[in-house]
């Protein structure tokens, strides 16, 4: 039997434990901001686009998202597939997004080395680069955006926001994923058309409404 002197402390702990439940079950658990993926134009850096033909349920099935698009941008024979997704389940976006976005399509490829780079034209952007395996040319670049910041280290993001995510409204993360099937061998990331396309998409998305 619990001693009476511990009752106040137990009550406090129970009350604290109930806060996340009350917030996410009875309150407005999702924060609605002003950003939408449809703010990204169908023409970027001279590349015109058409829908990729992905199933309408793709975003919901893989990312629990209704705010997403996937387009094939082409210019003078070059083609880059751009996928943008917003989700209140951040892990679905930052944990190997290529598994859902790139595999199982004609752009599909086995990626090798992963690194994060910063280009001089946009040093604030941590661009995640997925290099092709030996003999392949497909390359993918992606950027993650959450609550006004770009995410460079998803593990640190998860650690830093663990408590906040429990006691506050959920906020959406946004993935910008550019997939180039014919990148040159050992390219300079800054000079890739996919990099320019990715930057233009992000600038359009974040432009003041």
Describe the residue ranges of each PLM region.
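A short, solvent-exposed beta-edge/loop patch
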Residues: 4-21, 25, 113-209
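General structural signal for secondary-structure boundaries
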Residues: 13, 34, 53-56
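Alpha-helical transmembrane signal-anchor/signal-peptide segments
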Residues: 26-44
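Generic detector of short, well-ordered, non-transmembrane alpha-helical segments enriched
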Residues: 40-44, 106, 172
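Hydrophobic/aromatic-rich, well-ordered segments within soluble, folded domains that form packed cores
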Residues: 41-42, 48-50, 178-180
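Short, solvent-exposed recognition patches
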Residues: 48-166
């Amino acid at each position: 039997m619990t001693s009476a002197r511990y009752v106040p402390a137990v009550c406090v702990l129970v009350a604290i434990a109930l806060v996340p439940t009350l917030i996410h079950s009875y309150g407005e658990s999702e924060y609605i901001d002003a950003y939408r993926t449809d703010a990204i134009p169908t023409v970027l850096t001279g590349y015109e686009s058409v829908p990729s033909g992905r199933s309408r349920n793709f975003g919901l099935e893989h990312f629990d998202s209704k705010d997403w698009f996937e387009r094939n941008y082409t210019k003078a024979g070059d083609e880059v597939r751009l996928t943008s997704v917003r989700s209140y389940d951040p892990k679905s976006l930052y944990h190997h997004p290529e598994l859902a976005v790139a595999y199982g399509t004609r752009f599909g490829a086995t990626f090798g080395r992963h690194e994060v780079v910063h280009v001089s034209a946009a040093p604030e952007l941590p661009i995640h680069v997925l290099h092709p395996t030996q003999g392949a040319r497909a390359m993918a670049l992606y950027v993650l955006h959450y609550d006004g910041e770009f995410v460079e280290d998803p593990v640190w993001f998860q650690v830093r926001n663990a408590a906040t995510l429990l006691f506050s409204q959920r906020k959406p993360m946004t993935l910008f994923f550019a997939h180039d099937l014919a990148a040159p061998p050992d390219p300079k990331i800054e000079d890739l058309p996919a990099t320019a396309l990715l930057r233009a998409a992000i600038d359009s998305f974040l432009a003041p409404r």
